[in-house]
Amino acid sequence: MSADRIPSFSVAELNTAIGNLLERGFAPRFLVEATVSRPQLKKGHLWLTLTDGEASISAVAWASQLRQLRYRPEDGDGVTVVGKLNFWAARASLNVQVLDIRPSLSTVLRQFELVRRRLEEAGLLDITRRRPLPRQPRTLAVLTSVPSSALADMLRTASERWPMTRLLVVPIPVQGSVAARIREVLGRLAEEASALGLDALVLARGGGSREDLAVFDDEDLCRDLAAFPVPVVTGLGHEDDLTVADLVADHRAATPTAAIVALLPDRHVALRELQQQRQRLRELRSRWLERQHQRLLDRRQALALLTPQRRLQQLRQQLEQRRALLRALSPQRWLKQGLALVSNGQGMTIDGVKGVRKKDTLTLSFHDGSIETVVTQVRPQNSSSTP
């Protein structure tokens, strides 16, 4: 091959040509799944190594970009990096410029399990420490991003269900390394909870990936939630998502809207219940009035029995009853039926032959008069012949 057909470069030219070739021939943006190694902050820039166990490459997040990142990786974190290639011609050095970086799902789940275990050992996940939710709260603090579709849904649901409750909306960041900022808001609310008349706290975030919810696995944030002075309700992500914040809350709702539903009664249901209670009260009042009316009638009847006229009538009835009894038991009644009353000379009634002697004078009394007779013979009845 002739020398005039071989390209000739200086070192600088060669490196520049290689850089141009790489930058033109490679994707302007790409995703890298990797593990972070040796992250270091130098002059405001974050330097780190991305590795997968078989190969590694240097990466950098410039200070201007670093301020916009919502997540700061630590050594050993699994991450997904959005980046582009950077080639420094002076040293023929190649690295990845970080445009965005997020924790991988494995990192998020590992952190979740670590924090969950610590708080469980501290007793903060014990269901017996959960507080009951207020039945008709007057004031709720709602911590969520503003504006957001989740907030719009919550406000609409609250207005439809129980418009009497005041919602104190407190804007917070809900993604990235923002746990410290959320804790700051929680701290101020905890101090003012009594003055604000808070009945409960709602911590809400709309849908997203499980990695987006990683901030709600922060241990210090979850401890603050557990210590908050009023009941806490979480509505984070989707129904299948579970964070440590959900575990320490007094009630975990599947969505932000469900959190409002859990706290606010349905006014239509409440109205029906009120109408039913009114009907029960009317029925109770009617039955009570009926009982009182019957009791009054009974007492009036009892009083009527105590009047002199009524008492005299009762006495007359009793007297007549006794007269009838006396008439039924009177000897005259028996004498009229053909019987006679026998008495001796001393006027004593004779009820048998015992004690009667021959020549005794006896008096036989009939219903229309009496007869005196002299006993001529006494014939006692033979007891053995008595049938």
Curated annotation (Swiss-Prot):
Pfam family for this entry, one: Exonuc_VII_L
Assembly description: Heterooligomer composed of large and small subunits.
Role according to the record: Bidirectionally degrades single-stranded DNA into large acid-insoluble oligonucleotides, which are then degraded further into small acid-soluble oligonucleotides.
Stated name of the protein: Exodeoxyribonuclease 7 large subunit
Entry's Gene Ontology molecular function annotations: exodeoxyribonuclease VII activity; nucleic acid binding
Domain of life: Bacteria
Gene Ontology process terms (BP): DNA catabolic process
EC number: 3.1.11.6
CDD domains linked: ExoVII_LU_OBF (cd04489)
Signal sequence residues: none
Alphabetical UniProt keywords: Cytoplasm, Exonuclease, Hydrolase, Nuclease
InterPro entries in the cross-refs: Exonuc_VII_L, Exonuc_VII_lsu_C, OB-fold_nuc-bd_dom
Entry similarity comment: Belongs to the XseA family.
Organism (species): Parasynechococcus marenigrum (strain WH8102)
Localisation: Cytoplasm
Lineage per the UniProt record: Bacteria, Bacillati, Cyanobacteriota, Cyanophyceae, Synechococcales
